[in-house]
Structures are given as structure tokens and as C-alpha cells.
Amino acid sequence: MKREKTKMTQKQNTLTKTGIVALLACICCILWGSAIPLIKTGYRLMQVDSADTASQIVFAGVRFTLAGILVLIFASIREKKVMIPDKEILKYAVPVCLAQTVGQYFFFYIGVAHTSGVKGGIITGLGNFIAILMSCLIFRNERMTGRKIAGCVLGFAGVVVINLMGNSLDMGFKLTGEGFILIAQLSYGISTVLINLFSRKVSPVVLSGTQFAMGGIVLTLIGVGMGGHLGNVTVGGVAIIFYLAMVSAVAYTLWSVLLAWNDVSKV
């Protein structure tokens, strides 16, 4: 018992070191960044039109369902037993699933189809800052400080500058465009804070796998209900979906583990 407690303390000390947190967070961001061009390649191989939001949601649903299964398989191998989510896990996985996988991606895919890349990029950049504000002001998980406010302002300003370089910005606003992307980022902020809270009560790995699998199934059903489908299933397309599932499985699980040991603003 004492040995297990010592190991847990060592793990906590390691995962709260600023250098380690920064390195692992950067790895997550690199993995997420690598997914963007491959998503477009996957659409092309599976004949998913850029304006076919329903089929894009089906594509995302299959990806996240597979990601959830992969995470649960990994957890089972690590624990040397089949990790079947119990009532305790499901109690926490449902709200995370609704906020992150279902809410965020459903509104994001529809919003992206109805706005420009510049405005979409700027609004998407709000996600992390919304999460920090929610953690400090609504959920009261941490204190708001001048440094955090300055970090949010400078970070968002950087996102705006990068997205405006060589581009113009019109001031139009559509609910199904910019509005839906903003809702997606609010969902992301809520899910980030929920993961931060719930990962301290249950295994962040099992929580991540369960919410992915549940959310992926819901997204797939929503997409199919909207008339979506994957028109041309090829070996290359399947390989890309598998890679994207691995990206989600590794990056989001790692992100959840970081949130379990650190404040939202630090991650």
C-alpha cells in the first residue's frame, strides 16, 4: 500500500513539472495538427464532398468510435483485465461525451461549412481561453490572476494576427456559421473543465475511451440520420481513419491525464 502511494506521488510530481507539461501538451498539439491534412485526404478517398456535412459527421463518428475502442483496449492491456466501463465511469463519461465529442464536433462541422477559414480559425482559437475563464469564474477550480488574463489576451491576439496575415475579415455573423463554431468552442471549454474535475475521481484513460466510444456512436447515428454515408471505402481510407483514431486516442487521453494533475490554465 505504501509502495503504491509512493508511486502515485512520484507520478504526480512528474506530471506537474512545467517542462513535462509543456512537452506533453506540445506533443498533443502536434498530433492534432497532423490530423487536419489527413482528414481532407480521407474525405477525398472516401468521396465525402466538402459541403456534405452529414457524411463528414459520419466520418468523425467512425473515427471517434474506433478511438474509444483503442483506448479501452490499451487500458485493458495495461491493467491486465478487460476494462468494461461501470456505472461510476458512465456517470462521468456521459456529460463529457455530450460536451466534447457530440456537442463540439457536431456544431464545429456544420459551422465550418458555413463560414470562412479566417473567421473559423479565429473563433476556434477562443477554445482554450474560454476553458480557462470557465474554470476560474464559473466552476471556481482555480483563481483568476493578472498573468492568466494577460496570457489569454496575448494568446488570442496571436491567433487573430496569424489568421489575418494575407487575408481579409468581413464582419458578417451567421448562427449556422460563426455561431455554431462559437457553440463548439463553448462545448470544448465545458468539456475541458469537466475532464479536469472527473479525471481526479476516475481513471482518465478509461473515462477518455468511454466518452469517445459513446460520442462516436451518437455522431455516427446523427450523421446517418441526416443522410450521410461513406461512399467509397478503400484500404487507404481505412488506414487514414485508423491513424486519425490513434491520434485522438493518444492525444486526448494524454490531455486528460495532464488535466487530472494540473490546473486548466497550466495545460
How does the language model describe each region?
Residues L45, D49-T101, I130-M134, S187-S191, ...:
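Transmembrane alpha-helices of multi-pass small-molecule transport proteins
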Residues V71, A75, L133-M134, G146-G166, ...:
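Hydrophobic transmembrane alpha-helices of multi-pass small-molecule transport proteins
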Residues L31-D52, L66, Y105-T115, I123, ...:
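Juxtamembrane C-cap of transmembrane helices in multi-pass membrane transport proteins
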Residues G121-T124, R140-V161, M171-G177, T234-A239:
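Loop-to-transmembrane alpha-helix entry segments
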Residues S76-G120, T124, V161, L244-V264:
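Specific transmembrane alpha-helical segments of multi-pass solute transporters/efflux pumps
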Residues K2-G61, D170-L197, I217, L221, ...:
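Glycine-/small-residue-enriched transmembrane alpha-helix faces in small-molecule transporters
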Residues G42, F59, G111, L137-R140, ...:
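Hydrophobic/aromatic residues within transmembrane alpha-helices
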